[in-house]
Amino acid sequence: MGVVSLPGIGPLPLYGFQRPGMLLFGLVPLALLALYLVVQARRRRRLHRYTDAPVAQSPWRHLPIAVSLLSLVLLTIALATPTHDMRIPRNRAVIMLVIDMSQSMRATDVEPNRLKAAEQAASQFASQLTPGINLGLVGFAGTPYLLVPPTPQHQATIDALKKLDFADSTATGEAIFTALHAISATAVAGGDTPPPARIVLLSDGGENKPSNPSDPHDGVYTAARLAKDEGVPISTITFGTKGGEIEMDGQKVAVPVSTDQMKMVAKLSGGQSYTATNLGELQKSYNAIENEIGYRTVPGPGSAGWLRLGVLTALIATALALLINRRLPT
């Protein structure tokens, strides 16, 4: 739900009152308005007793009382404490970066190559991440390596990203299993309730070790289903273009990006799937993931804006009363 926000005043939410009973004070300005109308009617009748001629009266004389009543309404809303959505950093969440280091990541369709661009974007993601989040890193090709266990010291991940190097094959399923194991170890050490966790998987395509993604032991789909069962969604980022090439044994080999398997991994695990063909798009994908998992949205008190507006309106009413209804000494 959209919330109006005024410069110098702040947001003015009008839903989810924490103290709705205070809205009964809204009857006070209504009663005062009724009393004012009765007094004005009696005043007109009293004037007509002495003269039948119309008495010239400025309609502006009603403005101070109207603004005063408006200020009471605004202050009543402030007392009822409306709520608005607040983004609160997650302090115990665990995020595992899982980055493909296979030979296809040598492709230079993204400068300087897919892996280096992935390192740059992941480093920026780590540096901007909410400080209380535990961040870890798994690098993988044919074999996954837990390079950084989950830790709130994000610099450890930034340093490890600089050391990623190419290797043969792509064992995406094993890499996910490794990340899940690291998350489980953090949950055991962290207390009674497991922290919210997420895997961020970056690759340019599907796994080839094993060749069957549904392999019951190491298949990537098997790993994705386990992640779903453990409540760990996988956000996948498919990175690269259809025109990617690498040089092997003096020959150009096409390594086009493949999105189908990555999308299925995200779907099976309950996560989101992203695609990026350049560094800018990759950074946007990371930013979207950070907004999704780095914070949680909770209702918070939103009466400050109404209080400021009510006080400002009361001051305006006072100024109008002095300006319009002033009496000069004779």
UniProtKB/Swiss-Prot annotation:
Transmembrane domains' residue ranges: 21-41, 63-83, 304-324
One GO cellular component term noted in the UniProt record for this chain: plasma membrane
Keyword set, alphabetical order: Cell membrane, Membrane, Transmembrane, Transmembrane helix
Disulphide-bridged cysteine pairs: none
Subcellular location: Cell membrane
All residue ranges annotated as the VWFA domain in the record: 94-289
Coiled coil spans: none
Family matches, as Gene3D superfamilies: von Willebrand factor, type A domain (3.40.50.410)
Topological relation to the membrane, as annotated: Multi-pass membrane protein
Cross-referenced InterPro entries: UPF0353, UPF0353/GerABKA_families, VWF_A, vWFA_dom_sf
Protein family: Belongs to the UPF0353 family.
Protein name, per record: UPF0353 protein MAP_3434
